[in-house]
Design a protein with these regions (language model features):
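Gly/Ser-rich "nucleophile elbow"/oxyanion-hole loop immediately N-terminal to the catalytic nucleophile
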Residues: 42-86, 103
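Short beta-strand/loop motif that positions the catalytic acidic residue
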Residues: 153, 159-161
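Cap/lid segment of the alpha/beta-hydrolase catalytic domain
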Residues: 6-60, 118-125
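Hydrolase active-site cap/lid region
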Residues: 89-136, 188, 196-199
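Acidic catalytic loop of the alpha/beta-hydrolase fold
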Residues: 163-168, 195
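Active-site nucleophile elbow and catalytic-triad environment of alpha/beta-hydrolase enzymes
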Residues: 135-149
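C-terminal catalytic histidine-bearing segment of alpha/beta-hydrolase fold enzymes
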Residues: 175-228
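Short alpha-helix in the alpha/beta-hydrolase fold that links the catalytic acid
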Residues: 155, 169-178
């Protein structure tokens, strides 16, 4: 996944709708420094041990962000929505499973990092494409894989996936969704690759995620639509 600056405009737009918003950088860097010295191959750092893996502190930062939001006097005391695309979707699924009692809804688009041992089961693995022939790496991968957290998710989930996405293959996303015990709304984007290169390809996600957010903003429950 790329290393880039946070989108202040997107956060301001959500705030204008009445949301208390916190955009979380996946990396430990200053907002004023888009690259922050993060190496291009950061996903390989410490990948043979879960205590040294780069993703450990990424996940811990997410949890601490939630701790902070829960202390805000302007929080309504009940609604926490996790929303993200690609690696942001990966972190959203993880946090929903790590802190299930706090989360109201999860909205993810092409979540990365799922089904990391897919190569061993006849499926295509996606980012971070860790080597499946290294047992130590695979043990680490399965610990950080959102599939490992999905079985603990209690909140309703909206999950969009592109049928021609090779970064976050749809089979891997389904593997995670199948572990979630609660209600899930799969949202297929049939002609979409990773990160939806045109507005038309991501139309399903754009429309449905806004519908869900608006319902939640009005204080209504998100009730996922099941596939027929």
């Amino acid at each position: 996944m790329g290393v880039y600056a946070l989108n202040a405009h997107a956060v301001a737009s959500r705030a204008a709708q009445g949301w208390l918003v916190l955009d979380v950088d996946a990396h430990d860097k200053s907002p004023s420094d888009p690259q922050g010295g993060i190496p291009r191959d950061y996903s390989k750092i410490g990948d043979t041990n879960r205590e040294t893996c780069y993703f450990l502190h990424m996940y811990l930062r997410d949890s601490r962000v939630l701790d902070y939001l829960l202390t805000r006097p302007d929080w309504d005391g009940k609604t926490i929505v996790l929303m993200g695309t690609s690696q942001g979707g990966q972190q959203s699924l993880m946090l929903a499973g790590l802190r299930p009692e706090k989360i109201s809804a999860v909205l993810v688009c092409v979540p990365a990092g799922t089904d990391l041992d897919a190569d061993l089961h006849g499926r295509k693995a996606g980012f971070p494409n860790w080597p499946s022939d290294n047992p130590d790496v695979m043990r680490t991968a399965l610990y950080f894989d959102p599939v490992n957290f999905a079985r603990h998710i209690q909140a309703p989930v909206l999950a969009a996936f592109g049928f021609i996405d090779t970064v976050s293959p749809p089979a891997g996303i389904w593997t995670a969704l199948n572990q979630i015990p609660g209600p899930v709304e799969p949202l297929p984007m049939i002609e979409s690759e990773h990160n939806n290169l045109t507005p038309e390809k991501e139309q399903n996600w754009a429309v449905r995620s806004e519908e869900v957010l608006e319902a939640l903003r009005r204080g209504e429950a998100f009730r996922p639509r099941t596939m027929k």
